């Protein structure tokens, strides 16, 4: 954001709303998970949005995180030995993380854009992506997730049912209650049309 001047008017209002979505408590939980998942050598960021952004900005920690969710020998992202210092290399590393996260199962609507992290435009979107990644890791339960499973919501899983042909045929003969009564046609309790209601006291 060093090359970008301050925003005014409507742009400032929009940026202010985006910044209010950032959750500091969630940041603590995500940092805790990343440290447990990747190991203590990743260090810890300074508290706050800026510290979190600087910590993840070069893409190396994110790449280590997504690699740690895969079994040994099938790591999707190549992590450089020395963290990249050139801007385009850092952005490329973040883009590789995003591709690997998408391949892991994170849906497009949960993904942040590279500039959201690199320029700190929408750190709440970065949090959303990491939450989605953590939720998927807990849901898959393949032994690669490390940390407290209660840190993330477990996603609902598909429960596929197979019916036999005879069960499907039986279902055709059942009158569903969506179609009205299943007790047969009857005019019990009906009054004749045009006849006034009889009120007896």
UniProtKB/Swiss-Prot annotation:
Keyword Phosphoprotein applies: yes
Induction info: By growth factors.
Residues in Calponin-homology (CH) domain copies: 24-137
Keywords of the record: Acetylation, Cytoplasm, Methylation, Muscle protein, Phosphoprotein
Modified residues (Omega-N-methylarginine): 183
Compartments reported by the entry: Cytoplasm
InterPro entries (UniProt xref): Calponin-like, Calponin_repeat, CH_dom, CH_dom_sf, SM22_calponin
Domain of life: Eukaryota
S-S pairs: none
Modified residues (N6-acetyllysine): 172
GO cellular component: cytoplasm
Coiled-coil blocks: none
Annotated positions of the N-acetylalanine modification: 2
Main location (coarse class): cytoplasm
Placement of Calponin-like repeats on the sequence: 175-200
Stored Gene3D superfamilies: Calponin-like domain
Family: Belongs to the calponin family.
Protein role: Actin cross-linking/gelling protein.
Protein's name according to its UniProt entry: Transgelin
Source species of the chain: Mus musculus (Mouse)
Lineage of origin: Eukaryota, Metazoa, Chordata, Craniata, Vertebrata
């Amino acid at each position: 954001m060093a090359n970008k001047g301050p925003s005014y008017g409507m742009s400032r209002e929009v940026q202010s709303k985006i910044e209010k979505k950032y959750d500091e408590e969630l940041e603590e939980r995500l940092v805790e998970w990343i440290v447990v998942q990747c190991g203590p050598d990743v260090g810890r960021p300074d508290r706050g949005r800026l510290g979190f952004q600087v910590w993840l900005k070069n893409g190396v920690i994110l790449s280590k995180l997504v690699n740690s969710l895969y079994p040994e020998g099938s790591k999707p992202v190549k992590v450089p030995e020395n963290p990249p210092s050139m801007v385009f290399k850092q952005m490329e590393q973040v883009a590789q993380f995003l591709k690997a996260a998408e391949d892991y199962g994170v849906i497009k609507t949960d993904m942040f854009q590279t500039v959201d992290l690199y320029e700190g435009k929408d750190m709440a979107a970065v949090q959303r992506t990491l939450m989605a990644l953590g939720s998927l890791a807990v849901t898959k339960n393949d032994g690669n997730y490390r940390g407290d499973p209660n840190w993330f919501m477990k996603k609902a899983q598909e429960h596929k049912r197979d019916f036999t042909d005879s069960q499907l045929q039986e279902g055709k003969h059942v009158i569903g209650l969506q179609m009205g009564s299943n007790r047969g046609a009857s005019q019990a309790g009906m009054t004749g049309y045009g006849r006034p209601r009889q009120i007896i006291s």
